[in-house]
UniProtKB/Swiss-Prot annotation:
The keyword Zinc-finger does not apply. PROSITE patterns: RIBOSOMAL_L27 (PS00831). Disulfide bonds: none annotated. This is Large ribosomal subunit protein bL27. The gene is rpmA. Keywords: Ribonucleoprotein, Ribosomal protein. GO terms for cellular component: cytosolic large ribosomal subunit. InterPro entries: Ribosomal_bL27, Ribosomal_bL27_CS. It comes from Staphylococcus epidermidis (strain ATCC 35984 / DSM 28319 / BCRC 17069 / CCUG 31568 / BM 3577 / RP62A). It comes from the Bacteria.
Length: 94
C-alpha cells in the first residue's frame, strides 16, 4: 500500500488589516501676537482650550476661549497672582 504525504497550501495570501494610519489635524493653538507688539481691535491674541491664560485689561474672551483685543494698542503678557497668567492691551499715548 502506498502512503502519500501531501500538504496543501493556501491559494490566496492572507491579507492583514491595520487600525492605524490616521491622525487628527492640528488645531494651531497658542500665542498669535507677541509681548510688546502693536495690535488693532478685534485681533486674536491667543488661541487656547480652557483658560490657560486669562483676559486682562481691554481683552475679551470668545466662546472657544480665544483671547482677542478690544482696542488698538500694545500687547502685554503679565502674571496674575502666583500661578496664573493674563494678557492685556494698553492704549498707546500719542
Amino acid at each position: 500500500m502506498l502512503k502519500l504525504n501531501l500538504q496543501f497550501f493556501a491559494s490566496k495570501k492572507g491579507v492583514s488589516s491595520t487600525k492605524n494610519g490616521r491622525d487628527s489635524e492640528s488645531k494651531r493653538l497658542g500665542a498669535k501676537r507677541a509681548d510688546g507688539q502693536y495690535v488693532s481691535g478685534g485681533s486674536i491674541l491667543y488661541r487656547q482650550r480652557g483658560t490657560k491664560i486669562y483676559p486682562g485689561e481691554n481683552v475679551g474672551r470668545g466662546g472657544d476661549d480665544t483671547l482677542f483685543a478690544k482696542i488698538d494698542g500694545v500687547v502685554k503678557f503679565e502674571r496674575k497672582g502666583r500661578d496664573k497668567k493674563q494678557v492685556s492691551v494698553y492704549a498707546v499715548a500719542e
